[in-house]
């Protein structure tokens, strides 16, 4: 692949940020199934849209309908799933978007690989640290029940490990407080970090 050369864009990161009125970033929501990642990311997306900011939500289930529909849930397939999503998120970041990625992404090494794809401060890890007992009691898709019955093997949190972030930029337990206050915490972080205007 020595013949493949990266094409440099004529538009810079700072020019895209100036046009959009905010900096791009990847907010990576990680946590157990049922933790509230997609709900929280979706509510943040709605708030950013209300403010006239440019964002897009990449959801774990949705990408498996297209981009990653050929992948299963083996360790290798999970790694490839996160690699692909990381590359897509990087492209969206390059376009100047606030990319909201909601994936269980149970392995710390894979999340760190995505972080390494982008510049300093462009990857914001949001650990949705809702306890397993709460996630299992919610069980919106019936997955925990199936995993406990042995119908799903290698299910994160039950028969497969989840490696919690060591130093996430934000930690939110969705069983504490309400959705509005949790979104406000995310927005405050983005404002204080200079990603979006107040």
Curated annotation (Swiss-Prot):
Coiled coil: none annotated. The active site is at 105 (phosphoserine intermediate). It catalyses: adenosine 5'-phosphosulfate + ATP = 3'-phosphoadenylyl sulfate + ADP + H(+). One of its GO terms (molecular function) is adenylylsulfate kinase activity. The keyword Nucleotide-binding applies. SUPFAM superfamilies: P-loop containing nucleoside triphosphate hydrolases. Pathway: Sulfur metabolism; hydrogen sulfide biosynthesis; sulfite from sulfate: step 2/3. GO terms for biological process: hydrogen sulfide biosynthetic process; sulfate assimilation. Its EC number is 2.7.1.25. The keyword Phosphoprotein applies. It is an enzyme of class 2 (transferase). Catalyzes the synthesis of activated sulfate. Belongs to the APS kinase family. NCBIfam families: apsK (TIGR00455), PRK03846.1 (NF003013). HAMAP family: Adenylyl_sulf_kinase. This is Adenylyl-sulfate kinase. It comes from Shewanella amazonensis (strain ATCC BAA-1098 / SB2B). The lineage of its organism: Bacteria, Pseudomonadati, Pseudomonadota, Gammaproteobacteria, Alteromonadales.
């Amino acid at each position: 692949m020595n013949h493949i050369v990266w094409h440099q864009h004529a538009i810079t990161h700072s020019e895209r940020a100036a046009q959009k009125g905010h900096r791009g970033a990847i907010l990576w929501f990680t946590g157990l199934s049922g933790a509230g990642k997609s709900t929280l990311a979706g509510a943040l997306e709605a708030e950013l849209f209300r403010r006239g900011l440019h964002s897009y939500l990449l959801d774990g289930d949705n990408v498996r309908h297209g981009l990653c529909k050929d992948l299963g849930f083996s360790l290798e397939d999970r790694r490839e799933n996160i690699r692909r999503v990381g590359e897509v998120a990087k492209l969206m970041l390059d376009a100047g978007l606030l990319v909201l990625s909601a994936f269980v992404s149970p392995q710390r090494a894979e999340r760190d690989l995505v972080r390494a794809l982008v510049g300093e401060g462009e990857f914001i890890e949001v650990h949705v640290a809702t306890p397993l007992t709460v996630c299992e009691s919610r069980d919106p898709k019936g997955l925990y029940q199936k995993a406990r019955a042995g119908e799903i093997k290698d299910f994160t949190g039950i028969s497969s490990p989840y490696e919690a972030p060591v130093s996430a930029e934000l930690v939110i337990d969705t069983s504490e407080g309400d959705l509005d206050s949790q979104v406000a915490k995310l927005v405050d972080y983005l404002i204080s970090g200079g990603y979006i205007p107040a």
